[in-house]
Amino acid sequence: MADGVTLVDSTGLHSFSSSPSLSTSSSSLTAVALSLATSASAVTASYSISHLPPPPLPPVPTTMAGWIGWVFSFFFQVIPSVLYWVITFSTITLPTWLFTLFSMSLTFTMNFTTLLLIVLAMVSTISWFIRYRFLNMYSRLPPEPQRKEPQVDLFPDVQEGDSKPGLANYLDEFLSAIKVFGYLERPVFHELTRTMQTRKLIAGETLMLEEEKGFCLVVDGLVQIFVKSMRDGKSDTDEELHHLGAESSDEEHHIDGKQGYQLLTEVKNGASMSSLFSILSLFTEDIQLRENESSGSSSSSIALRAARVPNSIPTSPRGVMDSPSLGFQDHSDDTSNMITNGDLPSVPPLHLGESHTPPSGDQHHQQHHESRKHSSRKRRKSVHPDIVARAMVDTTIAIIPASAFRRLTRVYPRATAHIVQVILTRLQRVTFATAHSYLGLSNEVLGIEKQMTKFTTYDLPNNMRGAALDRLKDKFIKERDRLGSEEVTKGIALHNPSAGRRRRSSSFLRKDAALQVKMMTPRRAATVVTPESAPAEHDTYGVSPGDLLSTIQSSRFGPRYEQPPAKLQSPLAEKENTHFRLPAMQARHTFRRQDTMDEDALFRECILDCIMKGIGLTSSTRDALRKSSHSGDASPKLLSYDSRRQKAIFTNNAFGFIDPYEGSGDGETESLMSMSVTSAGGTSPVINLREELRNDIEIVYFPKGSVLVEQGERHPGLYYVIDGFLDVGVPIVEKGEDLVGVSKPAASKESFPTLKRTTTANSIGAGGTAANDSRRRKQSRKSLYLIKPGGIQGYVGAVASYRSYTDVVAKTDVYVGFLPRASLERIAERYPIALLTLAKRLTSILPRLLLHIDFALEWLQVNAGQVIYHQGDESDAIYLVLNGRLRSVLESPGNKLAVIGEYGQGESVGELEVMTESTRPATLHAIRDTELAKFPRSLFNSLAQEHPGITIQVSKLIAQRMRDLVERPVTEKGVERSNAGGVQTATSTVNLRTVGILPVTAGVPVVEFGNRLLHALHQVGVTNGVTSLNQAAILNHLGRHAFSKMGKLKLSQYLADLEEKYGMVLYIADTNVSSPWTQTCITQADCILLVGLAESSPSIGEYERFLLGMKTTARKELVLLHSERYCPPGLTRRWLKNRVWINGGHHHIQMAFRLTAEPSHPETKRFGTVLKQRVQVLQAEIQKYTSRRIRQTPLYSAQSPFKGDFHRLARRLCGRAVGLVLGGGGARGIAHVGVIKALEEAGIPVDIIGGTSIGSFIGALYARDADVVPMYGRAKKFAGRMGSMWRFALDLTYPTVSYTTGHEFNRGIFKTFGDSQIEDFWLEFYCNTTNISKSRPEYHSSGYVWRYVRASMSLAGLIPPICDEGSMLLDGGYIDNLTVDHMKGLGADVIFAVDVGSIDDNTPQVYGDSLSGFWSVFNRWNPFSSCPNPPTLSEIQARLAYVSSIDNLERAKNIPGCLYMRPPIDGYGTLEFGKFDEIYQVGYAFGKQFLEKLKTEGSLPLPEETEEKKKLQRTMAPRRASI
């Protein structure tokens, strides 16, 4: 019976027979039962044995003996029991259990159906696991929601004023008022304010501003400024104003009743009551308008003055010949006596009338008043006539008298010139720009330049005409015949052999001049002028042919160099021929070589001579200013200066101007206060400008029709017309002339920063489009006036650095002398009389209308973050941005802030609410320190009554503004509702003038980055050029005290001038984080670029903490520098996660850089250090070839110099970005791949990509690597997946929501993009979707790529909507299939829009008022039916879904800058992905043909030549074709 278990299979496996039968005898069954019982008992026995509890431990003893016994007991009793239990369990119990388990026999019975179901269940389980656990990785990605844009920074406005004590408040108001003078050094400030007076005006008291000879400002109170209406007729306003002043009660009633007076403006605390023109008149009272203005009476006055020379001054003919034609000179000799005693001379009133004998005592003042009254009949009585001020409340005003300005002109002439330069600049940027571009007063502004020609026209001498001019023309004619017509249009310049010597820096010239002064010291002893030798010397000077003016002046009386010198003895003749003298020996030497002088050089010298006289460098002004310097200071040192200058002036000063005007050798770094001190000894090195300027003169020939100056550009220099005529005119807009008869002032294509309306279009036309529009505009122009031979073109613009309001075209073949602007700047810097003369001429010819506008316009300085007005405030003024940047913020319920717009230099804000007298719709605050022109509503009302044309002009501007609001893209209207985050208004990227480059942390190569960006901006072509600033450049220009408390004023003025001069300024923060320069870079920036190394730690850097502490509201953008053109997935998100203040987007830039900067003082290298560095180099080389990143580098890159990352960033900053918009259309979107390849081959860069549906897929592929090759491969692979019917069939589901589950579609997109995020794309990218939960469009620029591309491609019914933060997203084409509006809002200037959507069937339907479905089916299959097939239910639903999309598409086609492309792909269906190659070739062929057509038409947006190249072509390129 022991063998009872043999019935079990020997292998121990279970038998699965279908019907086993076991037949045994009863004895055998008994034996089996007995054996089972035996086994059971054995098991029970073993179980009981193995589960016996271990023996109990002996009790714990309490004594030492007990402890020892207890230990022995433990070892001999417990341990053997444990060992016995372990052995029993392992040898008996465990084998018994195993034997019993394997001895059991089980039997299962099943049929085939059951077996098949089991197999299907197993397969289903495995497929479910693979599909939803392995292939479903895209649904298990960590959640990365779209990045929310930070709230607008709007810091609370600091209220200033009443909280300060009286004296501090008084000083603040006074300082804010005199800011109009620009930077004032301490001695200049004291000189200007030491004679200041204050007056108290009671409420209702009137003040005749015509009688107040000084600068008036309101310290405390409120003053209204009234102007006499011109409608009452022009009468003797002087007497009327005197009468009004005598009867204040009548005046009050007169003004209140609006009888003949109109309110101009209201002046509050800290504002000036004087206009800019009145300030200029105070500085320029002693300046002569034209040289020969008073020459008729000069001889008598010279003789009388010569008889009055006091004995204390050496009687030399110099004194006789220096006598001016100004009445001011009558008192200079008297005041020189006072200098010896140290007394301050009394400053008499000055005038520009005829010369007269100086009276004495009270008779002097009476005669002087009569003289002024007599001379005033020839010109305006006052610079501010018919202006009356009335105090509304008790008011305190401060008056700086005119005598302070006259004294300042004498003591600190260079400081005076600086102030005049500042005022002239503000005059152009405030008054002229407002009148010309905003109010449409072009005739008045352009008339100033026309009237200026009467002061600047000087004919060439007779001997330079006739045969000499014919010989000059012959040279040009021969050269013109030799060159082609294409080269001649650039102009032909006469060869100047001395031109090579002029290209030297000013520092070298200063050194040469100083060396020349030292070497000429022995010669001076021989040329000292004594009273005895003076007549002979002057004879020599009178006939010196090397003089700048002697040749011209002598030519008026015939060829003077042929006459004997003895004939030049009359004082008048001597005066006429002593304008600019050379040193005596040099004069004699040049006289001897007169006969051999080159004719071309003589032409240049004569042209320079006429230009000098034209800009005011004449003998009269020179002598007057020199004489005035005698009384310029009370210092006794100037007595020796007076005696020495009689000797030194001949050999040390080529022009004979007063020494305080010369200054020190380095005028850039010396302070203004040191000018008169440095020159007191007469030993300052003076550069002989004469030779320099003569070499700078170019004689250029321009054929008929050549453009010398384009409208809006900065004047290249002065053009002196030798022969021919120049036509000065303005372009006429093709849409029709304005009612005021001028060109459209708010034209968005004008390149100069004039006042214009804020539009979504950039102020600068990009590339070929701007050039093409410019060419079209030039076809129709309005001629204003002609410049005849002897005239100067560009006087006002070139001397004062204005931009041209006109263009200048050669009316005939014209020969001109050209003096570059740089030479004029040198003249203005060394001889301030040029600026003063310009200011005097401007004040003399100013129209009355411009004067009143200038009176009412208020110049404001606003600090960064300061609120100009709040939402809901009363609208009292229009604000024009002169310098800086403003932001308009809408405060919605719930304290949510939304940016409405940003306004840069030249733009205006507030017209709509001012004209409609409504409250402010939004809060306006300054992004950075800003200069504004405040245009009060009272001025507009006054101008509207006098000049209705102004009302028409502003009304047209408001109408255009309203039209822009109505036609604003849907995308911008829904900015605050969209969760796209990255959406910005179109104005936020337009008209950026300053860009700050700030490192995230120390060690970032910002200097190299800034230099590369500067180079890219130069190549892209920023209008008016671009420059960069770092701390070294500032210190070199302003000295080491540039960042001191006083130096900041000078620094701010210098930076404002740079921003006016250049189109863009880069501020590079190359100093440590706490330096003043870093703070300046932050406060001056419209946009801040935070530059970081992508591979370094993304933690917050110290510069960012400093930036946050500054509380700046400027735009902030993140720039990540990559050593290779690859961005790992998720890297950008880590950088942006903690930087909520990045509100302007981010950029990926490839730039090779050194991670560790080289030490300035490298230590001596040891052997170990060298070995370690060598190992690191080898590791880097090996890693370069073994890294996975090498496989991500681009495979294909077009050979285009403008496709670099820095060029892309440059285009974004200057508003010339190129956008690519790809529409949806299913398989037809494969044509996008071909179009993009055609763009690549044409060299057209793409900066921003936006797509819808299949366009978002193709666009994302291109934006990821900015490469065509990987895009082509991935797109073809995806098309293969989509073309598989098996995948579509396997994805079918019960159509409750859609026909498919969407899994295969998701898989195809996810396999293409992986876990990449939109932020990691190399190019900026967005896609649009339709949010059916909130019924709005959404634009996505962050988050996982596959999700939003999948959402943008989700066709309703075919694929289920994708869920995003609780909302359901569908295909973006339902609302907008071609997102040109949104692309324009992102700042793209040129947009390529590729439309591949299906064309709607617009066949007319005539099936009647009711329709039978059976007839519809029959009609569809009836080939003989003439009735069109009615649309099916699905077609009607589809058309209903795309209703709004069609409307947006039609509007997109008409957006300026949009190049609409429609490839011929109508024959392909939406799901025909299998025809990839065919559709691709169609798109490629169409793209090449379309771009070739644009290139032929000249409208292809390729980068055009830069502004510098244009200037070079116009002025310097002729040198290549020189004779």
UniProtKB/Swiss-Prot annotation:
Residues of the active site: 1253, 1371
E.C. no: 3.1.1.5
Compositionally skewed regions (Basic residues) per UniProt: 370-382
Lumenal-facing ranges: 88-109
Chain segments annotated as transmembrane: 67-87, 110-130
Reactions catalysed according to its record: a 1-acyl-sn-glycero-3-phosphocholine + H2O = sn-glycerol 3-phosphocholine + a fatty acid + H(+)
Activity regulation remarks: Inhibited by organophosphorus esters.
Motif (GXGXXG) on chain: 1224-1229
CDD domains, per the entry: CAP_ED
Regions of this protein lying in the Cytoplasmic compartment: 1-66, 131-1523
Residue span, PNPLA domain: 1220-1384
Sequence motif DGA/G, residues: 1371-1373
Main location: endoplasmic reticulum
Chain positions recorded as a nucleoside 3',5'-cyclic phosphate 2 binding sites: 841-961
Stated name of the protein: Lysophospholipase nte1
